[in-house]
């Protein structure tokens, strides 16, 4: 487990960028929408548009990974979640299932990659450093390292006292890429973990004796926590304001380009993502 130091100490520089903070989505909106938007925005960054930090939230969504979708009963489990009024999608980036609500902040750093040379560890450290720096007004205890039993586990889980509040993943395109993170700020981490745990139980189904069980994260709800629980962060708004100050101290914030992604292309992109990652399994 590594203590996090300031993101200014990483070798990956934070460029001048656009801060794009979307309003809280509604329960009727498809959680695939912001992911499709990021796919199109990433292409524009690859063509020379300014880098972006995309900040968004959805009030009730389950976002699963490619491997999750391949579990034997995944379609039925996804439909059960949808029937409860929760939006469900398979995301194009790496990682496993994540439960989203209004207390979870989603961050996506969209950066150019003209030389097609990505340092995965440096970029993950950059995002983890920003997240830890934004937590500094309340706690200096953020650490990175996989939290066994967490949902969406990875080497760059960000935790406080052994309980994970943030996971980081990446999505690559030809000339740009996206570093994504979820940050649990309000609410209870264990409740979100229980919902993910239930999804996996249903998606994996019953395994007959003598048959190897499907491979999926075994979630222990006690390993997850929100920043309200772990560090006394009062609200998503307070943490987001702190993150904005951290970013402003590292980079020039450019005016947001509202015409970067054309709305008419989003429906087509959403359909393409659904076809590739959900239907063709």
Question: What is the meaning of each model-derived region?
Answer:
Residues 162-170, 178:
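Aromatic/basic-lined ligand-recognition segments
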Residues 33, 37, 73, 119, ...:
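Short amphipathic alpha-helical segments
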Residues 144-164:
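Beta-rich nucleic-acid/ligand-interaction surfaces
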Residues 76-80, 84, 130-140, 242-250:
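Generic non-transmembrane alpha-helical segments
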